[in-house]
From Swiss-Prot:
Binding residue positions for Mg(2+): D16, E18, D209
UniProt organism field: Mus musculus (Mouse)
GO-annotated biological processes: L-methionine salvage from methylthioadenosine
Protein name according to UniProt: Enolase-phosphatase E1
Pfam family, one: Hydrolase
Cofactor note: Binds 1 Mg(2+) ion per subunit.
């Protein structure tokens, strides 16, 4: 087993989700298809609710910002618009954003609310790699703080950890960050996270499967290890040489233990 030693100054472990704690297949084959298959029904069922209207309003604002993009789908204002046409416009906008792998806050918020309904109804449970929960327990026993940083909304993150095949494991996580604090490819985001936690950036070890994110974190003086999991994107030879690579959280060695 390859062992990566965690620097002594590290007191916080920051985790990505997709491809790091959770198989990409679960996200791509379960979570996202659920949105596409159910968004129209969800909107029709919840349209009059305040939460749903807030989601639609945020999507409309995003659509206005996206108006200059090729193929962007507008969402008309409610007045004078046929309800089914309105709903279809929102559905089409969601499809368009997802087809372009957009990670807008507006899209993530609606997805989070849809997943909440599905998870709380027991229609799905989140999957984690087998090494994740035992490792997080060990880290916490060693005095580490554990945080999540994902492009998925904080609400969606809490759903995953609260409704998993391992049960409710939210108690193992000290806090959550999403794109509201900044994008994961922007080094400033990691400085903001450190400020929010109340530590220095070099007190953080970030685990991610995406080297562009790892590079951004390093620019902020955050320690990184790149996680290699089944189904993840391949790495270049240079990336394999440059980064500390792990295939399991059990390969991290804490000097304090």
């Amino acid at each position: 087993m390859v062992v990566v030693s965690v620097p002594a100054e590290v007191t916080v472990i920051l985790l990505d989700i997709e491809g790091t704690t959770t198989p990409i297949a679960f996200v791509k084959d379960v979570l996202f298809p659920y949105i596409k298959e159910n968004v129209k029904e969800y909107l029709q069922t919840h349209w009059e609710e305040e939460e749903c209207q807030q989601d639609v309003s945020l999507l409309r604002k995003q659509a206005e910002e996206d108006a200059h993009l090729d193929g962007a789908v507008p969402i008309p204002v409610a007045s004078g618009s046929d309800l089914q046409q309105m709903i279809q416009a929102v559905v089409d906008n969601v499809y368009w954003q997802m087809s372009h792998d957009r990670k807008t806050t507006a899209l993530k918020q609606l997805q989070g609310h849809m997943w909440k309904a599905a998870f709380t109804a027991g229609r799905m449970k989140a999957e984690f790699f087998a090494d994740v929960v035992p490792a997080v327990r060990r880290w916490r026993e060693a005095g580490m703080k554990v945080y999540i940083y994902s492009s998925g909304s904080v609400e969606a993150q809490k759903l995953l950890f609260g409704h998993s095949t391992e049960g409710d494991i939210l108690e193992l996580i000290d806090g959550h960050f999403d794109t509201k604090i900044g994008h994961k490819v922007d080094s400033e985001s990691y400085r903001k996270i450190a400020d929010s936690i109340g530590c220095s950036t070099n007190n953080i070890l970030f685990l991610t499967d995406v080297t562009v994110e790892a590079s951004a974190a390093e620019e902020a003086d955050v320690h990184v290890a790149v996680v290699v999991r089944p189904g993840n994107a391949g790495l270049t030879d240079d990336e394999k040489t440059y980064y500390n690579l792990i295939t399991s959280f059990s390969e991290l060695y804490l000097p304090s233990t």
